[in-house]
Each structure stands twice: as C-alpha cells, then as structure tokens.
Amino acid sequence: MVVIRLARGGAKARPFFNIVVADKRTRRDGRFIERLGFYNPIATANEESIRIAQDRLTYWRSVGAQASPTVERLISQAAKKAA
C-alpha cells in the first residue's frame, strides 16, 4: 500500500518535515517514491511553513494513496492559506 506521510529532517530540537509518498512498509525516514512538499513547524512570520504540490497530491490520491491523519490536517491548512 502507498501512503502519503511526513518524513522528519532537520536538526535536534529544530524539526523539518518532508511530505512524501512511500510504501507503507518502509521506515519513516527511509526510501520514498516522491517528495510532494514540506512542513516547517517552527517557521517565522516571513518564512513559508507549508508547501504542497497540489497536482501531484491529486494524482497520488487518484491512484489510491492514503494520507496520514497529520498530512490530512496539513492539506486542509494549506488549502485555507491558498484561498
């Protein structure tokens, strides 16, 4: 099964997450199929905190990829910012 989830990056106490498409059986930060965007939880006011490639997200959902609950929340936040 293919899932859309967060892969952690960044330094200790400075998290940064990539939004990736990966096989469900791989490790959280392991190999992934495609990077769809990023989430920076500690972004300052003048930095971008969420970016998601909507066209690729739509494609992966159309072929059956399931998004994690956290990614679902981030998708809705990004949609509110875009509107």
Swiss-Prot record:
Report keywords, A-Z.
Ribonucleoprotein, Ribosomal protein
Q: Which terms under GO biological process does the entry name?
A: translation
Q: Name one Pfam family in it.
A: Ribosomal_S16
Q: Which domain of life is it from?
A: Bacteria
GO MF entries: structural constituent of ribosome
Q: InterPro entries, alphabetically?
A: Ribosomal_bS16 (IPR000307), Ribosomal_bS16_CS (IPR020592), Ribosomal_bS16_dom_sf (IPR023803)
**One cellular component term from this protein's GO annotations in UniProt:** small ribosomal subunit
The keyword Iron appears for this protein: no
UniProt xrefs under HAMAP family: Ribosomal_bS16
PANTHER family per the UniProt record, alphabetical? 30S RIBOSOMAL PROTEIN S16, SMALL RIBOSOMAL SUBUNIT PROTEIN BS16M
Stated family = Belongs to the bacterial ribosomal protein bS16 family.
Protein name, as recorded: Small ribosomal subunit protein bS16
